[in-house]
Amino acid sequence: MKQFLNETVLRFITSSFIGTSFWCVFVYLPNAAFSILLFGILCTILLVEWKNLFRLNDFWFWFIMPWYPILPFGIMIYMSSTPCYRTLIYYLFVIVFAFDSTAYVTGKLIGVRKIIPHISPGKTVEGCVGGFMGALVTFYLSIRYQQITMPVALMFALVFIVCAMAFVGDIFESFLKRKAHIKDSGNILPGHGGFLDRFDAVMMASFFFFLFRSELTNLLCVQI
């Protein structure tokens, strides 16, 4: 229990720092600043963390890299630098980070039923349900604050799809780490590991936001 509390506090401090930093850059600095921040994170992943998953001369090192992580980060950089899609990046991070955080805490506290123990033994049904509920509440409060109305069924569906894709992204990175026999992709973020560990879920969910960017913009059209 003491170890869980220490890990949770460390993750909370790191998450708070990341969240606050992202919010300040996103809201108070020019649009290009957030794109530069994302590009810097991508470069760190490629130059520092990616080689921990694959050998440099490995075919998969070069085959997977353009699709993951380069393409999803390219999507996020494009959308964050485009005024009409900028709001979507805000909600992408809100939903995924809320899902990640509450899924972790719920899973550690009451998680029993493992989902894919041979790939990611820490993922449980209870954690995923808790993560979904946490993301749903956070998203609801966010759109209420922005005075956006949305049918309940549509809100449930949107959050569920984003959380499902975030879960797939998390599992995919866990699979890569399992193959590489490592626990974390890096150690730059205390309590989380590397940037790839923190952004794996966001990267996968970004595909959904990009594919349905026009429809989502009509729903979430308030500029942040």
Predicted regions and their residues:
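Juxtamembrane loop-helix boundary motifs flanking transmembrane segments in multi-pass membrane proteins
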Residues: 1-4, 42, 184-191
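Membrane-embedded alpha-helical bundles of polytopic integral membrane proteins
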Residues: 2-164
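Juxtamembrane interface at the ends
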Residues: 104, 174-182
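Interfacial loop-to-transmembrane junctions
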Residues: 179-201
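Final/C-terminal transmembrane alpha-helix of multipass membrane proteins
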Residues: 198-214
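Juxtamembrane boundary at the C-terminal end of a transmembrane helix
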Residues: 211-224
